[in-house]
């Protein structure tokens, strides 16, 4: 049976371990997306090779958001034109997952980067992205 240390050492099982990390701690590392949606698009990846967000253990959950916040602050210090972020996880093939190692997208947004950002993550189903307050009352 594998111990926790062995789980953290299964680096050859994930594509991400060959990429250039620019920040890491005991639980997560950060790297730039190879196909960025916007400049400085960052991936937050657990050190432990897991596939789903729902496999994070309680300690990883506790450490995820401080690490995410740290990456947000790095982006803001590098590019003050960033005014917003999209945060996303494609958890499962039907959600668009193509890499079988959990990773969280931190996508910096800037004024005017698209004509109308309304709906944000609702754009995963294009017909649902645009809506009005009237639509919400239905």
Model-derived features with residue positions:
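Long, well-ordered alpha-helical scaffolding segments within enzyme catalytic domains
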Residues: 60-78
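Short histidine-centered catalytic/ligand-binding loop motif
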Residues: 43-65
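Short beta-strand/loop segment at the start of cytosolic alpha/beta domains
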Residues: 17-36
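A short glycine-rich, hydrophobically flanked beta-strand micro-motif that places a catalytic Asp/Glu
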Residues: 80-92
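Short, small-residue-biased leader/transition segments that mark boundaries at the very start
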Residues: 1-8
């Amino acid at each position: 049976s594998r111990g926790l240390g062995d789980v953290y050492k299964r680096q050859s099982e994930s594509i991400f371990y060959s990429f250039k990390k620019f920040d890491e701690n005991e639980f997560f590392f950060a790297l730039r997306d190879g196909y960025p949606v916007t400049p400085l698009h960052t991936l937050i990846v657990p050190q432990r090779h897991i596939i789903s967000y729902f496999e994070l253990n309680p300690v990883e959950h506790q450490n995820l958001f401080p690490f995410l916040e740290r990456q947000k602050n790095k982006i803001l210090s590098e590019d003050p034109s960033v005014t917003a972020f999209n945060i996303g996880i494609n958890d499962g093939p039907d959600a668009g997952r193509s890499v079988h190692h959990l990773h969280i997208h931190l996508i910096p947004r800037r004024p005017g980067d698209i004509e109308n950002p309304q709906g944000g993550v609702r754009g995963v189903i294009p017909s649902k992205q645009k809506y009005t307050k009237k639509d919400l009352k239905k």
